[in-house]
Amino acid sequence: MSVYSLYHKGAFTRSTLVFPNDHKNLTSAQDEGQALYEITRHTCSMELIRCANAQTLLAGKYEGFTSRTMSLTGFGMTTKAKQAGVWKLGWKFIDFSSNEFTWRVSTTSSSWTLTDQGGRVVAKFTRARLRISKLGVLEVMERVDEALLALILVTCKIVHHDVQESEQSGG
């Protein structure tokens, strides 16, 4: 199992830093070393950047008026992610090997799970209790290649953003 901590990069940025392991705060994460990835979110797009060499691994662009579908390009391929349903906060995506995954979000829990097409839990995201700088902790249950990890990280960030917006709008 692999564990990652996700933190806001700063107070006035939409970027998220991804560190290995679970950390109490951003300072302890930074003391242990450089972030592995940075997820940048813009109004109509997202990027996953490997921090060690500033290489963009995955670029996503929202499609349509409602922004409920995203085209994702990276690793020499393109795929799509889309909202799991009209009134649902979860998202689905197809990886670069044509396997389907779904983020399942519970409105009564501070965590959500990523399942594969067979219903197996592949990853779990648990939101931080105090949501000042830490978004939460992502646990990836089994070894995955970097392409699938990139898709997991970006779609987890999309779901986190949607859940946050839903809470702020009272939905």
Describe each PLM feature range.
Residues 1-36, 41-43, 87-91, 96-171:
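Low-complexity or membrane-interfacial segments used for flexible interactions
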Residues 32, 53-55, 74-78, 96-100:
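Glycine-centered tight beta-turn/hairpin loop motif at sheet-sheet or coil-to-beta transitions
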Residues 40-70:
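Acidic, aromatic-enriched beta-alpha/helix-loop junctions
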Residues 48-50, 71-72, 81, 95, ...:
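Short hydrophobic/aromatic-rich beta-strand segments that constitute the beta-sheet cores
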Residues 61-90:
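Helix-adjacent hinge/juxtasegments
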